[in-house]
């Protein structure tokens, strides 16, 4: 129903976009008459008009006409009307659904150019580094022609290179790189270490992949935790002793385990504990669940392999080994214990954000994809994005054949090879889509046996695969590819002329970045030559039926199936698609497989005879809809829980930003001092009269905080307040606050004598920043721990989410109170020395890596032009330190681990350099490790200054 409601305004929107395209067309003649210099000068004219108050919406027709003409002059590609419509849809903050081959990459040039004119930056988000670099080079030619600067964010760049790229007018990069830079910026200890400059407008390419498929995996930066645990080994010993359906049950569809009462009693007997579910033992529940999951749900040589004493994950979608990735929440350690290999230490979360909440930071968000309609409800609900289907430039004439279903997988693959051989004989290009590398290799062997030449792609080497995909539409080309392989590159009948021309020029030693002038000079003649050759071949391919897409299995998402089909029939070309299925396929096994098997058995058909039935199609659609709904619920659930963290994250990050930007914190430090002293006094005077108060205990606690200058004996015996019984809480508080203020002023005077004027302000900044970071890390750990066990609240008829929100808020308030107390303690007691004089506060320039020098140079030039160069940076730099606080100003950076979604949506892990990591001593529960972390944080305080 929601889908239908969302589609009600589609027709009106498309008509509105058509009017925009028509208006842009009326300006074409005038723009075509302009010289190159006059066309480039339009950029400066537009910027002046924006400075004068003109709106981007008003500039749209002229800016689009200019960018369209520039693309024609530079790339020999002119935007079709439907691409202009798509560009307008993106500018207005929508998802433009454009079929494969309709030119999404070129479409993006229009809104990127228009929005970059504001000077606030545009981020173009792609699914991998290769596409980011390719698009920055390829489309960057148009933007540079118009006088804009283009940057690209790739993994492995230094902070200086990243900063230069972000200060360009348009920045290309992957979702993970943008997200991790945001998190790192909010871990920075100096303003000049931050690299991003805000979140103005983002265009997300393959928006369904990034905002839907990858949104289940949050971005996490983590560092080594303080201790490992021997509980993994203990539960790995217990799991084989427990019997399935006696001690526990397994749900393969939901991939969960549930422990029966008998199982709980068995574990309690084995461990010698009274109650597994009491608060002190609650961490053991996750160890038990993980051990049983490792036993029942994770199979060796299917889900993972063991190589050289290390557990390596196997990708369920592609079948390849995922080096460097680890399961989270203790699952990987449970498998290591099961396989009796070294159990590596758990990591502690230092910063985290979901992709949903990262992309909601942008003032305006837009996206492009060939398949968004099936996810329109989710895009609207979570991102407030409308989906606008853009008409195709030419009518679609591809023939989508009905599915063929075989009884066995072997029979299915025999039929696939026969079909491909028949097509190869007549020269028709074929693209075979598989769900795993294992199946790709199996098919490859079968093709080799039949002497069918072919290429195999497995979504690992993006650049090499893009080149193969670019030639997959040529006569007789047979290409086997996993679902994700080669995305972002068109399969053009006769070959992709842009890629073939680029390939030929690179073979001649020309490069668009290293030798731009020679490359541009040779581009047009080479392109025309390639076009003529390719068009002749394309006619031959059309004559034999165009590209044939053959799917060997249905994916759990209809979108992925549609993406595979969409490879064929681009731009009105002929084409054909068909899926071959078997009862052994994963989707069929999980849903309704038994019903279909019973039907085939009743029909008594031989294994090699397929059936085509509407019932099969309905069963598949039903199964896919169920899986899509389940995945949507998972993503919604992730977002609901992260929303609690998101509000807290905003408070902490805003506080860090204020500190980094050098805001005077004297008033804030004074308020903290008053709050902490007040809390101490309130705690000591909460009950009874003055004679009942334990002032000795209060004074002992206060002396740990600051050098108290008054004696409580004198206070009680003083004539100022009369008898002890006449001392009021207000009088006591007033005297102690005045005493604390005196001590703080004395501390400030001492520091200024040691390190000069402003030393106390600098210490306040350093202390607050470090304490905030430590307390936030501790809080993230506590919140992880809370979320792990919150599901058990459902057993007590309580809503886990409501409980998480309530307890999470209480923990956050408690953390802020502890933050004040620890900050005040550090400000008084930390040992301080004058900082050694630094030879220079300027950062030495870093050379850009090969292929990126132009981006770095262009960005540096942009900084100068926009006033964000050396002068602007100097104003925003953190002042040079004049003092050093022991235990706080620590330059050592621990090795960090980055977890984010891979292209297939599963978690991908990268580690920064930090030396070898060793497992810490075991034997502690997670709660004990948490306590140890807290104690270590406290003991890191140096010897305090005596008052």
From Swiss-Prot:
Transmembrane segments: none
A GO BP entry: protein targeting
Residues bound to ATP: 83, 101-105, 490
Taxonomic path: Bacteria, Bacillati, Actinomycetota, Actinomycetes, Mycobacteriales
Recorded catalytic activity of this chain's protein: ATP + H2O + cellular proteinSide 1 = ADP + phosphate + cellular proteinSide 2
Top-rank taxon, per record: Bacteria
Compositionally biased region (Basic residues): 935-947
GO molecular function: ATP binding; protein-exporting ATPase activity
Annotated HAMAP family: SecA
CDD domains reported for this sequence: DEXDc_SecA (cd17928), SF2_C_secA (cd18803)
Compartments reported by the entry: Cell membrane; Cytoplasm
Keyword Protein transport: yes
Organism: Mycobacterium sp. (strain KMS)
UniProt entry tagged with the keyword Membrane: yes
Family according to the record: Belongs to the SecA family.
Function according to Swiss-Prot or TrEMBL: Part of the Sec protein translocase complex. Interacts with the SecYEG preprotein conducting channel. Has a central role in coupling the hydrolysis of ATP to the transfer of proteins into and across the cell membrane, serving as an ATP-driven molecular motor driving the stepwise translocation of polypeptide chains across the membrane.
Amino acid composition bias (Basic and acidic residues), ranges on this chain: 925-934
Main EC class the enzyme belongs to: translocase
Name of the protein this chain belongs to: Protein translocase subunit SecA 1
Gene: secA1
Residues covered by region (Disordered): 860-947
Record's subunit section: Monomer and homodimer. Part of the essential Sec protein translocation apparatus which comprises SecA, SecYEG and auxiliary proteins SecDF. Other proteins may also be involved.
């Amino acid at each position: 129903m929601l889908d239908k409601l969302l589609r009600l305004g589609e027709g009106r929107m498309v008509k509105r976009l058509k009017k925009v395209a028509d208006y842009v067309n009326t300006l074409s003649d005038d723009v075509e008459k302009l010289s190159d210099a006059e066309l480039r000068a339009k950029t400066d004219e537009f910027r002046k008009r924006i400075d004068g108050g003109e709106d981007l919406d008003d500039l749209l027709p002229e800016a689009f006409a200019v960018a369209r003409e520039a693309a024609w002059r530079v790339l020999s590609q002119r935007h079709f009307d439907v691409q202009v419509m798509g560009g307008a849809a993106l500018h207005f903050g929508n998802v433009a659904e454009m079929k494969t081959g309709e030119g999404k990459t070129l479409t993006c040039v229009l809104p990127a150019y228009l929005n970059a004119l504001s000077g606030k930056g545009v981020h173009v988000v792609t699914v991998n580094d290769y596409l980011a670099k390719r698009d920055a080079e390829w489309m960057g030619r148009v933007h540079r022609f118009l006088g804009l600067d283009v940057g690209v964010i790739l993994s492995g760049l230094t902070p200086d290179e990243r900063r230069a790229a972000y200060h360009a007018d348009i920045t290309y990069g992957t979702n993970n790189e943008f997200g991790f830079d945001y998190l790192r910026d909010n871990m920075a200890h100096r303003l000049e270490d931050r690299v991003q400059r805000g979140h103005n407008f983002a265009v997300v390419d393959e928006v369904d992949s990034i905002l839907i498929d990858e949104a289940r995996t949050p971005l996490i930066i983590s560092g080594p935790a303080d201790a490992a645990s021997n509980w993994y080994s203990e539960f790995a010993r217990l799991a084989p002793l427990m019997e399935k359906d006696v001690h526990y049950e397994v749900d393969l569809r939901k991939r969960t385990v549930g422990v029966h009462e008998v199982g709980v009693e068995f574990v309690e007997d084995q461990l010698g504990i009274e109650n597994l579910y009491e608060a002190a033992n609650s961490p053991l529940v996750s160890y038990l669940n993980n051990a049983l999951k490792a036993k029942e749900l994770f199979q060796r040589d299917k889900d993972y392999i063991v190589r050289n004493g290390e557990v390596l994950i196997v990708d369920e979608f592609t079948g390849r080994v995922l080096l460097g990735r680890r399961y989270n929440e203790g699952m990987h350690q449970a498998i290591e214990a099961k396989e009796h290999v070294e159990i590596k230490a758990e990591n502690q979360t230092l910063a985290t954000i979901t992709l949903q909440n990262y992309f909601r930071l942008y003032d305006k968000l837009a996206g492009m994809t060939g398949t968004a309609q099936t996810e329109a409800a989710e895009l609207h609900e979570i991102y407030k994005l409308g989906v606008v289907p853009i008409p195709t430039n030419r009518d679609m004439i591809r023939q989508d054949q009905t599915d063929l279903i075989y009884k066995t997988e072997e029979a299915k693959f025999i039929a696939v090879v026969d079909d491909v051989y028949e097509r190869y004989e007549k020269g028709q290009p074929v693209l075979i889509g598989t769900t795993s590398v294992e199946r790709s290799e199996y098919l490859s062997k079968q093709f080799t046996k039949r002497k069918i030449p072919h290429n195999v792609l497995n979504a690992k080497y993006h650049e090499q695969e893009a080149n193969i995909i670019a030639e997959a539409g040529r006569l007789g080309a047979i290409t086997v590819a996993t679902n994700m392989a080669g995305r972002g590159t068109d399969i053009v009948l006769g070959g992709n002329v842009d890629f073939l021309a680029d390939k030929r020029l690179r073979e001649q030693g020309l490069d668009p970045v290293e030798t731009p002038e020679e490359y541009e000079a040779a581009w047009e003649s080479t392109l025309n030559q390639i076009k003529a050759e390719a068009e002749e071949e394309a006619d031959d391919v059309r004559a034999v039926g165009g590209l044939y897409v053959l799917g060997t299995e249905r994916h759990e998402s209809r979108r992925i199936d549609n993406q595979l089909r969409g490879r064929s029939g681009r731009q009105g070309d002929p084409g054909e698609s068909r899926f071959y299925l078997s009862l052994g396929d994963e989707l069929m096994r999980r849903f309704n497989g038994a019903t279909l098997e019973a039907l085939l058995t009743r029909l008594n058909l031989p294994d090699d005879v397929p059936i085509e039935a509407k019932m099969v199609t309905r069963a598949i659609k039903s199964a896919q809809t169920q899986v899509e709904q389940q995945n949507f619920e998972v993503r919604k659930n992730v977002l609901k829980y992260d929303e609690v963290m998101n509000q807290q994250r905003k408070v902490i990050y805003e506080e860090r930003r204020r500190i980094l930007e050098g805001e005077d914190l004297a008033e804030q430090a004074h308020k903290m001092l008053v709050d902490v002293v007040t809390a101490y006094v309130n705690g000591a005077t909460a009950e009874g009269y003055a004679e009942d108060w334990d002032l000795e205990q209060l004074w002992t606690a206060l002396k740990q905080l600051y050098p108290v200058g008054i004696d409580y004996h004198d206070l009680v015996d003083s004539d100022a307040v009369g008898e002890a019984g006449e001392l009021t809480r207000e009088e006591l508080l007033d005297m102690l606050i005045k005493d604390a203020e005196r001590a703080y002023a004395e501390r400030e005077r001492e520091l200024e004598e040691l390190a000069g004027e402003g030393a106390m302000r600098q210490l306040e900044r350093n202390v607050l920043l470090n304490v905030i970071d430590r307390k936030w890390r501790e809080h993230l750990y506590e919140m992880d721990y809370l979320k792990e066990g919150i599901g058990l609240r459902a057993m007590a008829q309580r809503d886990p989410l409501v409980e998480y929100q309530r307890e999470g808020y209480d923990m956050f308030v408690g953390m802020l109170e502890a933050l004040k107390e620890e900050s005040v303690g550090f400000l008084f007691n930390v040992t301080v020395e004058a900082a050694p004089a630094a030879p220079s506060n300027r950062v030495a320039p870093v050379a850009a890596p090969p292929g990126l020098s132009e981006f770095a140079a262009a960005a540096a030039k942009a900084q100068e032009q926009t006033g964000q160069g050396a002068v602007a940076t100097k104003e925003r730099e953190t002042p040079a330190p004049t003092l050093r606080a022991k235990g706080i100003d620590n330059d050592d950076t621990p090795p960090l681990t980055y977890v984010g979604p891979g292209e297939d949506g599963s978690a991908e892990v990268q580690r920064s350099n930090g030396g070898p990591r060793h497992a810490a001593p075991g034997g502690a529960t997670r709660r004990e490790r948490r306590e140890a972390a807290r104690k270590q944080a406290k003991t890191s305080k140096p010897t305090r200054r005596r008052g």
